[in-house]
Amino acid sequence: MSQAYQPDSTKTSAKTPVAPTVATLNPPKRKTLMRLLAYLKPYWWAILLTIIGFAINAATEIWIAKLLQYITDAINQNDQSKQDLFPFIIVMLFFVRGVGSFLGNYYTALVSRNLVYELRVEVFNKLLRLPSSFYLANPAGTISSKLIFDVEQVTAASTDSMKTLLRDGLTVVALMGFLLYSNWRLTLILFVVLPPILWLIRVASKRYLKLSKGIQETMGDVSHITNEVINGYQVVKNYGGQVYESKRFDVTSKKNLRQGMKVVVTNSINTPAVQLLMAMAMAVVVWLALRPAVIDDISAGQFISYIAAAGLLSKPVRSLTDVNQQLQRGLAAGESIFALLDEPEEADTGVLSPTLAGEIKLDNVSLVYPDSTVALHDFNLDIRAGETVALVGRSGAGKSSLVNLLTRTLTTSSGQITLDGMPIEDIKLESLRAQIAMVNQQVVLFNTTVFNNIAYGSLAHKTPAEVEQAAKDAFAHDFIMQMPNGYQSEIGAEGLQLSGGQRQRLSIARALLKDAPILILDEATSALDNESEYYIQKALDNIMKNRTTLVIAHRLTTIESADRIAVLDGGQIVELGTHTQLMQLHGHYAQMYARDFE
């Protein structure tokens, strides 16, 4: 197998792994709202108490207007007995009003915070079930923005808007009922301005929705840039990227600022316009009410009460106008959240949960990425159980793609992969991944203790003795015991308090503790100093015993002892054999090996 051949282009059009993106078709606005309201069903009792509370609050608005009538008439009639009661009535009225406000505000907040909790947990759990291709297609900052920013905006649509609609909506209904009861002819004039108000709200709604989507997109960009700078702070500092990153962040933040100011302008025009219409209607009502034909039929108290009730309409109407902006912003965020929740999850077609021996066979396997890049083409390789096979080749040769296929992070475009004779797609994902341990160049550690990082996830049931033995086999025990609290020491975010070699040894200890029949070492010793590499190589020798091992390496001196070495180029194996055999071929491997010593 010493000759390379060109991939047959007719075979690369097979099933292509498609990376899902967040940018899917947005559902209709009404559908989004109904879906949001469905989250409120379990809290119907709290919403009922909210309605009762705000209904009490609305009733007190009527009594405030009515009280003005009684006070005015009592003064005109010089009725001292009634006047002595008014201070007590005022105190009781505002006490009842306070009880109603408390019920409404408290239970609205209860629904709101629980909704944030439920949505956030649902989105986070959804992220755990999405395929790797989703993360390749969407920046981390955009994803985290959905979890943090969009969820809060959705809550505003579902609960804060509900609070305003109930509180001020009930107040408007109560006051309009009182006005109709007091003088229905005058009150009908107020309804004349209703059509233009509704038209203004409709126009503003479309504007708010469009701008809210723009704000969300720019917030995702802001979060993405921030994540990049935080994660790559060393590169930013070492290469003097502060000015560039500052300008990039400034441009994105200004986009967000402009979108936000457009919302302010829209709201600043819409709200006064609605208020002006209401004021015009009120002016007509007051003018007519002062006509002799009208005012002669009512007392001064009734007149004051009617005008006061009409004046009290202004604030709730303004609030109902303002809530439209909040509602549209929340609906835009809801569309974004639901688009993510509707993303197809990682497909698990498996039905088998076997205990694997570690035999791997790849038969005419091809992998084509969505951008038509051919990663593997008619790839064939048989690996015996317990055998160590090293994969070498230049960047882009297909080494990492092959590993992703074995863990089903990606799926084949064509061909077949079998483990112990079983098609890989017939094995349950949980069972498959439980029997594959990986040690990567980019070590992933979590902001918790050393113990929890080694006994991570499904390994949490392991005993302290088992964890300690794994650490000893990984040559990590000694430096762990030198830490302030030993295995219970916190290692900081991403384990940055540890050296590269120490972090790698913890990763190896985790793989040892997993005790899986198949081991994948992906550039596990690159970018390390000689002492760290010495200990890690000894640890790797321990972990590779009696396991099927795939080793991806750039430095060929680390894989000379492999049972076989596969040289990849253009997504195919161009040479296969032991180190000695490949050196005798004087082909690709020999040339790469010679370059290692130049």
From Swiss-Prot:
Amino acid composition bias (Polar residues), ranges on this chain: 1-15
Keyword set includes ATP-binding: yes
Membrane association type: Multi-pass membrane protein
Positions annotated to bind ATP: G393, R394, S395, G396, A397, G398, K399, S400
Molecular function, one GO term: ATPase-coupled lipid transmembrane transporter activity
Pfam family, one: ABC_membrane
Keywords on record: ATP-binding, Cell inner membrane, Cell membrane, Lipid transport, Membrane, Nucleotide-binding, Translocase, Transmembrane, Transmembrane helix, Transport
Top EC class of this enzyme: translocase
Disulfide topology: none
Region (Disordered): 1-21
PANTHER family associated with the record: ATP-BINDING CASSETTE SUB-FAMILY B MEMBER 10, MITOCHONDRIAL, ATP-DEPENDENT PERMEASE MDL1, MITOCHONDRIAL
Protein name (Swiss-Prot/TrEMBL): ATP-dependent lipid A-core flippase
Organism: Psychrobacter cryohalolentis (strain ATCC BAA-1226 / DSM 17306 / VKM B-2378 / K5)
